[in-house]
Curated annotation (Swiss-Prot):
Coiled-coil residues: none
Lineage: Bacteria, Pseudomonadati, Pseudomonadota, Alphaproteobacteria, Hyphomicrobiales
Binding residue positions for [4Fe-4S] cluster 1: 94, 98, 101, 107
Amino-acid positions noted as binding [4Fe-4S] cluster 3 in the UniProt annotation, renumbered to this chain: 224, 227, 231, 259
Protein name in the entry: NADH-quinone oxidoreductase subunit G 2
Biological role stated in the UniProt entry: NDH-1 shuttles electrons from NADH, via FMN and iron-sulfur (Fe-S) centers, to quinones in the respiratory chain. The immediate electron acceptor for the enzyme in this species is believed to be ubiquinone. Couples the redox reaction to proton translocation (for every two electrons transferred, four hydrogen ions are translocated across the cytoplasmic membrane), and thus conserves the redox energy in a proton gradient.
Residues where [4Fe-4S] cluster 2 binds: 148, 151, 154, 198
Residue ranges of domain 4Fe-4S ferredoxin-type in the record: 139-170, 179-209
SMART domains reported for this sequence: Molybdop_Fe4S4, NADH-G_4Fe-4S_3
Amino acid sequence: MIKVTIDEQSLEVEAGSTVLAAAERLGIEIPTFCYWKRLPPLASCRMCLVEIEGLRRLQPACATVAADGMVVRTNTPLIEETRSSMLDMLLANHPLDCPICDKGGECELQDMVMAYGPGESRFRDPKRVFHSKDIRLSPVIIMNVNRCIQCQRCVRMCEEVVGAVALGTVEKGMDTAVTGFEGSLASCDQCGNCVEVCPVGALMSFPYRYKARPWDLAETDTICPHCGTGCQLTVGARKGEFMRVRSDWEHGVNRETLCVRGRFGLDFIESRDRIKRPMIRRDGTLTPVSWEEAGDFLRQRLGVAEGKAAGGLISPRLPNEVLYQFQKLMRTVLRTNNVDCSSRWSAPLDILVPIVASFYSRDPLEQVIGKDCVLIIGGNVTEENPVTEYLLRDAARRRHTRLLMLSARPSRLDADARAVLRAHPGGEGQSLAAVVAALVAVTDEGLPDDIFAKTSGTTASSGANDALDRLVSTLKEGRSVTLLVSVDLLRSPLARKTLEQLGNLLQLLRLLGKEPSLQFLFDRANQMGAWDMGVLPGVLPGLSPIADEATRTRFERSWGAEIPREPGADVDAMLELCEKGGMGVLYVVGSDPLISYPDREFVERALGAANLLIVQDAFLTDTAGLADVVLPAAGYGEESGTFTNNEGRTQALRKFREPAFDARSNLAIFGFIAALRERPLQPSTETVIFEEMTRLVPAYEGLTWEGLGADGAFTTSAPKPWTSGFFAPLSAPAVTDVLQLITGNCLFHNGYVSEHSETLNSVADDPFIEMSAQDAAGLSLSDGDQVLVRSARGELTAKLKVNRRFPHGLVFVPENYRALRLNSLMRRGEYPCPVEIRECAKRAASALDEERV
């Protein structure tokens, strides 16, 4: 620690701290323009100049490292004159259009001029004008170059934090201007972080343009509803209508940054596809009715359907309190453990739960990725969890964390990684087994004898040996290791085997003293919370097995009802039960299995065979189109609760308006259903349910609603001993020359909910098919061609996107476009999906030739 004195106030700071950071700790304000906390100091704006005793010239506080015994003054006549002169120079060419500028009322230049600027400008010359009109750089970002003060925040944010490198400067001197490539941002991430950090109105949000002033907005701090990173954001609404999103440096895992979905994708709540009133099926047609009529219909149709003849499926996008109450409703009112929270895959709980219990880290992401090594397994973190990617890039570049990649899809983070090991989709388990075997082989001592027998005979795929050697040597050298695992691993029919190999690697790292931490990279906002709340067929809240007598008794006493003893059916088994005519009632909340579960034909047949299909949602989904009863539920921002993100951080989800139309909150609808069965469901409010959760779920003990604050609160877990031992290695996957189709989220969408966003659709409305340049050339295809993808079960058409970094033999189709009906190509229990591709025009010509013959 060193001692510094600033404006006659002394304090001790860590060596390496800047004068600006020391002043902030004392509450002394030093004005800045170019400085931003997530970026290295630039010291170009000269607003933060201070006097340092013993130095002749003023020094920039943002870039000057404090020294022991240093004496600093921040508010002398010379400093005041210098600041005033700097502001006068900025105003010399700054347009006087504050009344029409969107930044009016929250402009840093306005604030600085009022606090430190001259009362009158010395300059009388005509102002420099680049363009007479604003330039629309992209569908969501618009620019007024005349207002730019050349702080370079936007350029550096785009390059150093986001990694897109879409903005840059052209010309020099007075003619310097910020712009995109060829005056456009068409190829950038459209995240809007440049807009967020712009201190003036140079970069603006086009969807928000001219809509409101900051003082007109009612602002609500809440959580992003898209991926599992759990970014904190502030929604601005006027008279209940969504206007914009901004974020705050001080709070949340994201520290002010957001991705395109979080900043521009929340307008989905204003979609025209909202369900306005309850509907029941009459004469084969869904007919709008009142809640009373819907209740009468349900009372007649529900009958005595319960137990194994009842099932429930709910979305992991909903709050913890809704998820908790749903599984409680299913178990105590409908008397069934047939509950699940995924409509895309069935998780092998018998291996997943022990891994989570033994290795999952509920620590801040910044702490977890600050370890010596971070191994990212599966998926594409750039597109699935963009803000997590920002944090990982920062860790690699500024904190010297060693990144390692093991996945099928390329990622922008590959450029910052020490080793990139390409895995075959569905073959991640084989790659993990190869890592374990290689790590055991280079370890001299300290390992049990049985490890060598259970990990021998596994080798990496052809061409991967160099990458494997680099990855293993980095793991061996590292003092501590974090594993970030994509949910892609759960899509494969080999998910169980893959998780076994993940367990092997975690065990081995623990034996080697690497202090392994595990976190999943969930692509749904509350998937972690859904697991914690027990929305799974074989566990109760807290991931406690149904078969555990003591745990079951504790919940039965609290709920005042008996819980079925046998584990229930997962989504796959429930659909099979429906198809066979054994499902009396299937209750689907916020989920759409008809569009998301593999084999659309099977799912449609199964849902149609259910005796009673109840769909509760904010939007009219494909599954709702088959329902017997449709109940309009509150959408995002219309009910309160909590989300638990990938870190295990529980955060408050706050509503900013009442449910639209005739919709009701999900909790109110659960109470409505329970009342029809004459089995009241208590408690019924978010806060009281939260209190019950904190009493019954060990990881949530000690949390309070009031204590969540702006940063949320971390759940806790004491790692349980691993008792499963080491699993046998996997055999090598079969090699095939057939193109293999994989799926996942694209950067601009998340699931299907984001398709209701007009803004996101303006950025990425058209579906696409992505493949390597090598494969495209082999098929005589070019970027932008309309192509046909055909499997044994179906086909689809979309534009081709050629990616030179994409692996040979793979085809990627995003899961986010409902019109594609991607699941109609897939077979249950098969992933990846073998396909063939051809150009649509060639296919049409071929068909015409066949007709002529």
